[in-house]
Amino acid sequence: MSITAQSVYRDTGNFFRNQFMTILLVSLLCAFITVVLGHVFSPSDAQLAQLNDGVPVSGSSGLFDLVQNMSPEQQQILLQASAASTFSGLIGNAILAGGVILIIQLVSAGQRVSALRAIGASAPILPKLFILIFLTTLLVQIGIMLVVVPGLIMAILLALAPVMLVQDKMGIFASMRSSMRLTWANMRLVAPAVLSWLLAKTLLLLFASSFAALTPEIGAVLANTLSNLISAILLIYLFRLYMLIRQ
């Protein structure tokens, strides 16, 4: 059977509309978890204020020079802030991926589904999803730091890994290998969706500061919710595409 991107886009749109409230609640809950965890593990406001003390920003030629000009205490605060942001984001993304994929599975099985039920049902696979998303993010970031293009290619090749891990109960590395092989064979169907997702996330990041007009916390939750909705659409597309490819 010939698979067209247009038909998968149409199926994705229909599912997203029909399950919008459930997906929205999952996205909102994951955004709230991300923001709360980030706040809990981040340095205090007083510690963050120390990052500006005695650091000659205008005289620094780059990020590495800026970090080198910091005191050991400031470097530790920066490391803690970065680790808190990364950890909270990975937790939120893992719960989002598990929740959205479980929504699709439950709806496909004809069962009633709620946001809490989907997240609860995904609990057993969350540790594996967390590790998978961590490894995927690490590989993509390394690729982007090198020449950008390798990072984009890795993001595309590993896109199906979360779906395979949950749907077929694969191991972490097995799902990554299988995703690379299957995506390479169906690049024309996967690449445009992943690149559109990356573009949408980048545009959202550019306008994220405008959400802080309310309060920083509410703005962060709103921005993360929109980001999660964008990721949910991609997950629905990839799940539907994977089911069609397997037929």
From Swiss-Prot:
Describe its membrane topology. Multi-pass membrane protein
Localization: Cell inner membrane
One cellular component term (GO) for this entry is:
plasma membrane
Matches recorded under InterPro entries: UPF0259
What are the protein's UniProt keywords? Cell inner membrane, Cell membrane, Membrane, Transmembrane, Transmembrane helix
Query: Which residue ranges traverse the bilayer?
Result: 20-40, 87-107, 118-140, 153-173, 187-209, 225-245
Pfam families to which the protein is assigned, alphabetical: UPF0259
Regarding protein family, the annotation reads: Belongs to the UPF0259 family.
Protein name according to UniProt = UPF0259 membrane protein YciC
- Organism of provenance: Escherichia coli O139:H28 (strain E24377A / ETEC)
Lineage at the top is:
Bacteria, Pseudomonadati, Pseudomonadota, Gammaproteobacteria, Enterobacterales
Q: Which gene encodes it?
A: yciC
